[in-house]
Amino acid sequence: MGIIEKRITKRHLSESELSGVNYYNCIFERIQLDNFNFRDCEFEKCRFVNCSIKNLKLNFFKLIDCEFKDCLLQGVNAADIMFPCTFSLVNCDLRFVDFISLRLQESIFLSCRFRDCLFEETDLRKSDFTGSEFNN
């Protein structure tokens, strides 16, 4: 099933509303996506604004040309995202996020705060971390 150009502002979504669905050019605003198991999902050209994204499990999950702004990402194993994987983060808090072995060339991480995040063997060539802070 595909959802195109929709603004989603419902505060609490159910896991079944998101799994098995492809989203294109949608805006997710003030959404809480905590403890979800995303299976067979694709988000392309979507924007996530002021969202809480914690402790996700990702299976057959794609993220293509998406933007995260003013979001909290915590306990996410981004290494489970399928290729291609392209996104930008602006003014986001990232805690315990695993980027190990991802190819994130030319990714944008502007004014983000990284706490206890893993980047081992991650390809970050030409990525922009302007204004970002790192703490372990």
Task: Indicate where each model-derived feature is located.
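Tandem repeat scaffolds
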Residues: 1-136
